[in-house]
Structures are given as C-alpha cells and as structure tokens.
Amino acid sequence: VKAINIKNAQRVGIVYRGDDEEAKELVERYVKFLKNYKVKCKTLGYYNADELPRYVTPKLEYDYFVKKDLNWKLKTLIPEVENFIQTPFDILIDTTVKEDEVLRFIVRKSQSTFKVGAAGLKDSSDLDFTINLKEGEGLRQLMKGLDNYLHLINKN
C-alpha cells in the first residue's frame, strides 16, 4: 500500500452510482478540481438499469456501465470496466456510502495502489484508507473528508 497525496497523484480513478444525481454532480465537480492539479482522472459510473439514459454519453474521463453488462457473478462483459479495473490508479476513490455489491466488486478487483472510501460497510476491509461517517452523513461529507485527508497524507 502506497499512500499518496492528491497533489502528487498522476492518475485517480473514481467509482460511483451514475443513477444517483448527487453522486454524479459531486464526481463531476471533483474531476474538474483535480484537473487543476494536472491529475488525470477516469470515472466509472454504474446505472442499475438495462440501458443508459439517452442523455448520458461517455466522454474522455467518464465511462459507464449498466446491469446487463455484468453476468450473475458480477463479472464484467465490457472492455470499459475491465480497462478501469486493470488501470493501476495512484488513488481509487470509492464513493459508496451504502452497501453496493456491484461497485464494491469493481473496487475489490481494481489494480489501484491506494483505495479510499467510507468506513463501516461490509467490504470496507478492501480499502486502504477509510473515513468514518456520522449518522445521517452521506457522500458530500465523504468526499469532503477524503479530499481533506488526501491533501494531508505524505505532504511535501
């Protein structure tokens, strides 16, 4: 495990629920923020549906997948997900704040060197660094906490 400061990261991966408007908005904002540090970002958004909504189109930093792209063992059937898993991101941000076996599967299989996310979930042991959320806190507080600590870790 190699903990890395966000300012020193070259590549950051983010997994999130694309069908969660708050998650989508926060991830898009954070990607813009990281680009100011010249950090390359790749996000993978999951839609619990058979098809992507018409208004969703993959872009340079944004890939998506849907329920039908997985088999019953949650093994991916599309190259975008496999490429994301195989990319050794300096930091992988898991945005799940509730149990989500699909996104946790991606995090578990990821080749990233430093995986961060929320504590207290069933598979939090797959993460190298976690943030404890208080009752009623959600993704906004997780992202704020992670950003704060990722700026403090291994500060030069």
Show which residues each predicted segment covers.
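Residues at the starts of beta-strands that form the adenosine-phosphate
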Residues: R11, V39-K42, F114
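Histidine-anchored nucleotide/phosphate-binding helix
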Residues: D20-V39
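Structural beta-sheet core signal
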Residues: I14, T43-G45, G117
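Structural motif
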Residues: V15-D19, Y46-Y47, T95-V97
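Conserved nucleotide-cofactor-binding alpha/beta core module
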Residues: K35-N83
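Active-site and donor-binding regions of nucleotide-sugar-utilizing enzymes
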Residues: D69-L133
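Short N-terminal or domain-adjacent regulatory/targeting segments
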Residues: V1-R11, E21-K24
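Active-site-proximal region of nucleotide-activated glycan assembly enzymes
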Residues: S125-N156
